[in-house]
Every structure is written in C-alpha cells, then in structure tokens.
From Swiss-Prot:
Protein name per Swiss-Prot or TrEMBL: Ribosomal protein L11 methyltransferase
Source superkingdom: Bacteria
Coiled-coil boundaries: none
The gene coding this protein: prmA
GO-annotated molecular function: protein-lysine N-methyltransferase activity
Major location (coarse): cytoplasm
GO aspect biological process, one term: methylation
Organism: Chromobacterium violaceum (strain ATCC 12472 / DSM 30191 / JCM 1249 / CCUG 213 / NBRC 12614 / NCIMB 9131 / NCTC 9757 / MK)
Record function comment: Methylates ribosomal protein L11.
EC number: 2.1.1.-
Length: 298
C-alpha cells in the first residue's frame, strides 16, 4: 500500500484553518511546520522549554497525507475554497508503505554516558554487556538520556554515588534518574512527578530494569529526607521549589539541579545558596548542572 503526500505552502495565519479543511475534504492526516524548517531561517517556537515567545514563524508548510487513489488537486482546491483562499502552491510525492516500528526504532541508538553507564533501547543489543545498561525506550514521559540536562544528571550519579544512598528524583519524568541511581548502588530511590502518566511510565521502566523504586504524585509523597535530591525540571519551578527541595535534603546531603539554561545559572545558584554550599556550574550544549551540599538548618 502507498499514500500520496502533499506539501502545501501557506501563510501561518490561515495554516491551521486550511489544515482542518483538508481533513474535512478527505485527507488522512495533516501536520504544520515552519516553511523554513531545517534551514538557517528556521524560527524557534520556544526559548526556555515550556515558555512560548511572541514570535511564531510567518510562513508554514502543511504536510498532508492522502489515499493513493485520491484526486489531490481537487481536494486541495476544495479545502482552499472552503477557507475562501486562492489555490495554494503545493507538491505531491508517493510515499511507500514502510515498517514504521522498525523505522522509528532505527532512529534510537544506545547512548553512552560513560564507560560503565549506557542507555539502551529494549530492542537493541547492549553494546557494552558488562556495563550498567539502563533499558529505556522513547515514550510519553520526558527522559531518555539524549537531552543534555538528563545526561548531566546521569554523569553526576555515575561519578559521585558511593553506594547505599537514599535518592529523591523530583520531576522524575521517565524515572531514568531514580532507576540509574539504584543500578549504580543507591539503597533506595523515590520519584515524584505532577503527571500521573509519568508516574505510571516510571513504574513500568523500573520494572523493566529490575529495580524497586517508589513513584508518587506530589501530594502523595511521604515527608522524608534523602542523601541526594535531583531535580531536572526547569528554571521557573526551580525558583519556586527551593525551600521545598532543601527540606528534603539531609544535612551534608547533596542537591543536583538541571533544566537550567546557561544564562540562568548565576541566578539559580544564588537562590539555592540560601541552603547549600554551591559548587561551580557544569555546562553542556547551553544547559547547566548545579550542585551543592546542604548546610545545617539554622
């Protein structure tokens, strides 16, 4: 089986309306992207992840899939007419059926964190069988080890865990940091996330990796203190959660923060210096890891 894929040029102001009209006209799927995607003219949607900026791209490209037997020109004309638009410029190509699962899997290779720590998709043979291999597949929750912030936290765990620590992963996403901590020798690990889906994904991933960790929503987490607290989230929540995160760290314990852009490092370090002796920041691809040691409460 094959499909016809139409690429349609559109002004961004009407792209969503035209995409909806294409679906009404018989398209199987539509997607809207920057007309300059993949070029030096591409415009970012986000600055800090999760914070939209005012500027959005001005020219869009609508990628539309049709049945192989469809009269693409007629359907595009009908959609444009429904939107009271002139016939847009477009191109059509034939897309052959593929093994989409295999194609998707081929895009995710094992990730080396260090000589002894790897992240390996479940369908892939471990490249270093004697290393600590975290089995983790791309899914609905953030955290596969490919992002610099996750990598920075994993590198810290790999180098700094001595064994038998209690660990809290605040904003656990996929559970990757809690799972890694256990496989690297931590005695216990707890993960907290505001998303129930992330809590479920973390539980599934822990089972996949043969470790026992507890994952909770914030209001269900028992009050406790830990030897190590990790929070790989974003700068804004880290600004607001300082007192809470500090309360979970034992005196002499360690805090590890990421999800921080390089230009935000000084501000966040100053905030957390209220409770911690802060270490110099570590940078990776424009992102920052901050760490510190908990002082005794006054």
């Amino acid at each position: 089986m094959a499909w016809l894929q139409a690429t349609i040029d559109s002004d961004s102001a009407v792209a969503e309306r035209l995409a909806d009209a294409l679906m009404d006209a018989g398209a199987l799927s539509t997607a809207i992207e920057d007309a300059w995607a993949g070029t030096d003219k591409e415009q970012p949607i986000f600055g800090e992840p999760g914070e939209p900026v005012d500027q959005l791209w001005s020219q869009s490209r609508i990628i539309t899939l049709f049945d192989e037997s469809a009269d693409v020109a007629l359907l595009i004309a009908a959609a444009a007419n429904a939107c009271q638009l002139a016939m847009p410029a477009y191109s059509v190509e034939r897309v052959e059926e593929q093994d989409w699962v295999r194609l998707t899997q081929s895009q995710f290779e094992p990730i080396r964190i260090s000589d002894r720590l790897w992240i390996t998709p479940t369908w892939h043979e471990a490249p270093a069988p004697n290393a600590v291999n975290l089995q983790l597949d791309p899914g609905l929750a953030f955290g596969t080890g490919s992002h610099p912030t996750t990598r920075l936290c994993l590198q810290w765990l790999d180098k700094q865990l001595q064994g038998n620590e209690s660990v809290l992963d605040y904003g656990c996403g996929s559970g990757i940091l809690a799972i890694a901590a256990l496989k690297l020798g931590a005695a216990s690990a707890v993960g907290i996330d505001i998303d129930q889906q992330a809590v479920r994904a973390s539980q599934d991933n822990a089972e996949q990796n043969g470790v026992k960790a507890d994952f909770f929503l914030p209001n269900a987490n028992p009050a406790a203190q830990y030897d190590v607290v990790l929070a790989n989230i974003l700068a804004n929540p880290l600004r607001m959660l300082g007192d809470l995160l500090a309360s979970h760290v034992k005196t002499g314990g360690r805090i590890v923060l990421s999800g921080i852009l390089a230009e935000q490092a000084d501000e966040l370090s100053a905030i957390y210096s209220q409770w911690f002796e802060m270490d110099p920041p570590v940078f990776d691809e424009g992102w920052t890891r901050l760490t510190g040691t908990r002082r005794a409460a006054v």
